[in-house]
């Protein structure tokens, strides 16, 4: 039985991980988890899976829960995330927290040689060089949870990376894929949150609509698979059935297919190198689907993807600045402070003004992250 620590338990990926853990009790045991402010979901997880350690966002919630559950240890805040990540009993850490807050706790778990199932794009985007160097140093395994990177990982299994011609990451196009840039001037938050294929959290659904999500995934693929940017392509694929493809020198293309269900890559990262049956999984019926559609990526239609490639090729702290600007701009859009098209514009303005540091340490990354968010807050007032 594998013992699991979970960061970001009450978010979209975390809750789907919980769904797997409660159905696969013979395979996995949850020993520690972190949650935010959702006490209803936190209590449900405690009641169902009885972990040893729980971290919440606020101290008052931790004190309240400690009275209700005297046999469980409760902690809170940023230090609580590190405690969950480094729980001595767990061998696998699922990092499903949103944004760059998962960085320090992930590095702490890596230094203990744990297997990291990483669903937190921002950790790899802002500090990929640190994460992979530390993983190599401490012999920690990094497994992708994103459906696209899981697909690439599976399509590379048993192959020599030197034989790869290119990685092809598929993109649904998001909630506005049939709209022109001109039509996007007046879209609402509710419009943007209506994703055609996937059930995801608000931030990633907006990122999907701007295509920044795919940009982050391109950078993530570069980091995880040590692949140059000129060998990473993005292909529009409306149905989200082919999750990604790997093309080899001999023109062979290996792809991973399946119905759009995030539990599949989550469970694969947990059970790897084994596969176990998925509870209530929907089997793929290609005859029923009938047709799959593909289009070349339009970088003018999706400037956020162009910006992500630019930041990736430049490297250094511009990756942190781009990511922090995006997170802050998306939050401003969700709060009704800026329009949808101003998300891209805000990111570009931040990137143009940024003074890049080529090989940043952790402290520099965190400082740039914090400063960039303040800059965007001032811009959107």
From Swiss-Prot:
Binding site for Mn(2+): 146, 148, 217
UniProt-listed Enzyme Commission number(s): 1.1.1.267
Cofactors demanded by this protein: Mg(2+); Mn(2+)
Pathway recorded for this protein: Isoprenoid biosynthesis; isopentenyl diphosphate biosynthesis via DXP pathway; isopentenyl diphosphate from 1-deoxy-D-xylulose 5-phosphate: step 1/6
Any one Gene Ontology molecular-function term assigned to this protein's record: 1-deoxy-D-xylulose-5-phosphate reductoisomerase activity
Keywords: Isoprene biosynthesis, Manganese, Metal-binding, NADP, Oxidoreductase
UniProt binding sites for NADPH: 10-13, 36-38, 120, 122, 201
Coiled-coil residue windows: none
Binding residues annotated for 1-deoxy-D-xylulose 5-phosphate, in chain numbering: 121, 147-148, 172, 195, 208, 213-214, 217
The keyword Transferase is annotated on this UniProt entry: no
Record's catalysed reaction(s): 2-C-methyl-D-erythritol 4-phosphate + NADP(+) = 1-deoxy-D-xylulose 5-phosphate + NADPH + H(+)
Superkingdom of origin organism: Bacteria
InterPro entries: DXP_reductoisomerase (IPR003821), DXP_reductoisomerase_C (IPR013644), DXP_reductoisomerase_N (IPR013512), DXPR_C (IPR026877), DXPR_C_sf (IPR036169), NAD(P)-bd_dom_sf (IPR036291)
GO terms for biological process, alphabetical: isopentenyl diphosphate biosynthetic process, methylerythritol 4-phosphate pathway involved in terpenoid biosynthetic process
Name of the top EC class for this enzyme: oxidoreductase
Assigned protein family: Belongs to the DXR family.
Function of the protein: Catalyzes the NADPH-dependent rearrangement and reduction of 1-deoxy-D-xylulose-5-phosphate (DXP) to 2-C-methyl-D-erythritol 4-phosphate (MEP).
Protein name as it appears in the record: 1-deoxy-D-xylulose 5-phosphate reductoisomerase
Organism per entry: Lysinibacillus sphaericus (strain C3-41)
């Amino acid at each position: 039985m594998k013992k699991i620590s979970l960061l970001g338990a009450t978010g979209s990926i975390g809750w789907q991980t919980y769904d797997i853990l409660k159905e696969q009790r013979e395979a996995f045991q949850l020993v520690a988890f972190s949650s935010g402010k959702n006490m209803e979901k936190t209590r449900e997880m405690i009641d169902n899976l009885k972990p040893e350690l729980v971290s919440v966002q606020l101290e008052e919630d931790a004190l309240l829960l400690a009275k209700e559950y005297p046999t469980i240890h409760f902690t809170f805040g940023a230090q609580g995330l590190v405690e969950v990540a480094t729980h001595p009993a767990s061998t696998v850490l699922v990092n499903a927290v949103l944004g760059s807050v998962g960085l320090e706790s992930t590095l702490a778990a890596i230094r203990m040689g744990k297997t990291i199932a990483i669903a937190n794009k921002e950790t790899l985007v802002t500090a990929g060089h640190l994460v992979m160097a530390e993983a190599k140093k401490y012999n920690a395994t990094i497994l992708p949870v994103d459906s696209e990177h899981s697909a690439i990982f599976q399509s590379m299994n048993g192959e020599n990376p030197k034989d790869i011609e290119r990685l092809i990451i598929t993109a649904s196009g998001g909630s506005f894929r049939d709209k022109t840039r001109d039509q996007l001037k007046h879209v609402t938050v509710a419009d943007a949150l209506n994703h055609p294929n996937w059930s995801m959290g608000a931030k990633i659904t907006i990122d999907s609509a701007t295509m920044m999500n795919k940009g982050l995934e391109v950078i993530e693929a570069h980091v995880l698979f040590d692949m140059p940017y000129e060998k990473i392509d993005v292909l529009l694929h409306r149905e989200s059935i082919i999750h990604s493809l790997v093309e080899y020198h001999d023109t062979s293309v290996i792809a991973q297919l399946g119905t759009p269900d995030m539990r599949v890559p989550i469970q694969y990262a947990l059970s790897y190198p084994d596969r176990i049956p998925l509870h209530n999984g929907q089997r793929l019926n290609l005859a029923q689907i009938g047709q799959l559609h593909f289009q070349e990526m339009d970088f003018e239609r999706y400037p956020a993807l162009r910006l992500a490639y630019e930041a990736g090729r430049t490297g250094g702290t511009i990756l942190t600045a781009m990511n922090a600007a995006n997170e802050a701009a998306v939050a401003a859009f969700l709060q009704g402070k800026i329009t949808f098209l101003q998300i891209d514009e805000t990111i570009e303005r931040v990137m143009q003004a940024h003074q890049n540091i080529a090989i940043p340490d952790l402290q520099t990354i965190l400082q740039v992250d914090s400063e960039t968010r303040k800059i965007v807050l001032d811009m959107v007032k």
